Amino acid sequence: LKKKIAVIDRQKVNLSTVAFVQIKTSQHNMAWAKKFVEGVKEMDEVIEFYRLSGASDYLLKVLIPNIEKFDEFYKKLTNKIDLSDVTTSFAMEEIKQTSALPLNYI
């Protein structure tokens, strides 16, 4: 086990909006990546953060109370570091969410 967690109903803690933020960059050097990663890790709204292959370079899963708070988050993100493109999709409905791992591959 890495750690034990409590699963909290995000609606009850005013985090009803889920945003998936795709980021493209023209910068692919270590100095830029380090600054970007450190900046994103400081942002409490980001609950998942991935470096990707394909059309986008990074994907963030962000929890916020509403669109106005997302706009504040977006401005904070884009002021931290130079990004080529930021595209956001908002979840309309959560169909499945789990932290349980698929252990049938062991």
Describe each region flagged by the PLM.
Residues 1-106:
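A compositional/biophysical signature of low hydrophobicity enriched in polar/charged and small residues
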